[in-house]
């Protein structure tokens, strides 16, 4: 059965501010029953900068996911409940790894938004987090240069408000896109 909704995949390098952009767009959007922002499930402790559901490895293995992947020793999942949202015609907005975009495009009607920032900005943001060594940050920055096929780009280099407004504009235009088989 064709899905009438659309899965908006938000991708970008670590430090680009994907969660910040999503949070700001969601705040600006207010109540919109046709646009949903499901929480990612991650095998990582809670983090105030990232809206996710923290779970153990065992709990992660018991869950059902529409999309899942592993990166940096962690497991990430998008709840299977998004399939019902897509079937109901909703726009479902999720922060995912660039590595799963091709698989997601094969399985769901997708629109990919890349959130970007200059390398110096990425480096500064990653350093402030204090989750990684300088070598690990360098490796992340090297991966950040890898291209991703995106339908739209949000440059998050000024304020969260500006990037959130740009992203919200993209989301609102997604309402007008034709349904995909």
From Swiss-Prot:
Pathway: Metabolic intermediate biosynthesis; 5-phospho-alpha-D-ribose 1-diphosphate biosynthesis; 5-phospho-alpha-D-ribose 1-diphosphate from D-ribose 5-phosphate (route II): step 3/3
Catalytic activity: alpha-D-ribose 1,5-bisphosphate + ATP = 5-phospho-alpha-D-ribose 1-diphosphate + ADP
Residues involved in ATP binding: 12-19
Enzyme Commission code: 2.7.4.23
Keyword annotations of the record: ATP-binding, Nucleotide-binding, Transferase
Enzyme class: transferase
InterPro entries documented for this protein: GK/Ca_channel_bsu, P-loop_NTPase, PhnN
Keyword Nucleotide-binding: yes
Coiled coil: none
Gene Ontology biological process terms in this record: 5-phosphoribose 1-diphosphate biosynthetic process; organic phosphonate metabolic process
Top-level division of the source organism's lineage: Bacteria
The keyword Phosphoprotein is annotated on this UniProt entry: no
A molecular function (GO) term: ribose 1,5-bisphosphate phosphokinase activity
General function of this protein: Catalyzes the phosphorylation of ribose 1,5-bisphosphate to 5-phospho-D-ribosyl alpha-1-diphosphate (PRPP).
Annotated family: Belongs to the ribose 1,5-bisphosphokinase family.
Protein known as: Ribose 1,5-bisphosphate phosphokinase PhnN
């Amino acid at each position: 059965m064709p899905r009438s909704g659309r899965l908006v995949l938000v991708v970008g390098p670590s430090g680009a501010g994907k969660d910040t952009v999503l949070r700001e767009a969601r705040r600006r959007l207010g109540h919109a029953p046709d646009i949903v922002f499901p929480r990612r499930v991650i095998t990582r402790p809670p983090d105030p900068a990232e809206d996710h559901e923290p779970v153990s490895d065992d709990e992660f293995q018991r869950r059902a996911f529409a999309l899942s992947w592993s990166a940096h020793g962690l497991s990430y999942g998008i709840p299977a409940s998004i399939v019902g949202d897509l079937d109901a015609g909703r726009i479902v907005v999720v922060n995912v790894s660039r590595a799963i975009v091709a698989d997601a495009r094969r399985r769901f009607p997708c629109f990919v938004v890349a959130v970007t920032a200059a390398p110096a900005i990425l480096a500064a943001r990653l350093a402030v987090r204090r989750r990684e060594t300088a070598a690990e940050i360098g490796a992340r920055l090297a991966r950040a240069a890898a291209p991703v096929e995106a339908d739209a780009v949000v440059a998050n280099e000024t304020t969260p408000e500006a990037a959130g407004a740009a992203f919200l504009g993209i989301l609102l235009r997604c309402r007008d896109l034709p349904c995909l088989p």
